[in-house]
């Protein structure tokens, strides 16, 4: 598993900084089809529900078919919104470690649930923080998208990782992490169980990776409790984002996860 953070897709700073839209959805009161983590008072702390303007539709079969040389299928998938807090305009560094751990637990539960659907080969979590990152809504939220295909970039990285393993019989991510720990110059945050660092050749401004120190390929398999689990990840992720926000206020956060092992494989 890996969290990517940074300003990818930012070609330059615009002369006029875009702003949030004035209208914020009534997420605090939305209850239909919602999954939530609640507090002792029974009120929700974090909740998730289907996006009202989804990129994909969850109903129906994929209907894969060939059209001559080309392939086609329906835009079947899932698109959900994670509302991370009841409080408007909060930024991730303003969350407590416990609050951010609750967000990660809900995400983990939704990822595991979507993996049970054999149509979905990959589940992607992304968070656009600020107008420059493409977010038009100030209320803290992220998106979860399940697709019937594996993104091309991820397929490339899986091939590179396999080539590295075939040649050296070691995990590529673990080798990179061990080298960064030995070098020390690009480390951002370090804990006994997770590490945040800037990669050797970043692809975009302020690119930062968050990796577990112990080999783990799937976010759904991280323990929901303890320093080696989601609470430890939440604490380091919050500190990392706080450091980033001393430099920029708008950025992207993406969960780099393993493909769905339970997914159907296309015939042929």
PLM features: residue spans?
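HIT superfamily nucleotide-processing domains
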Residues: 1-268
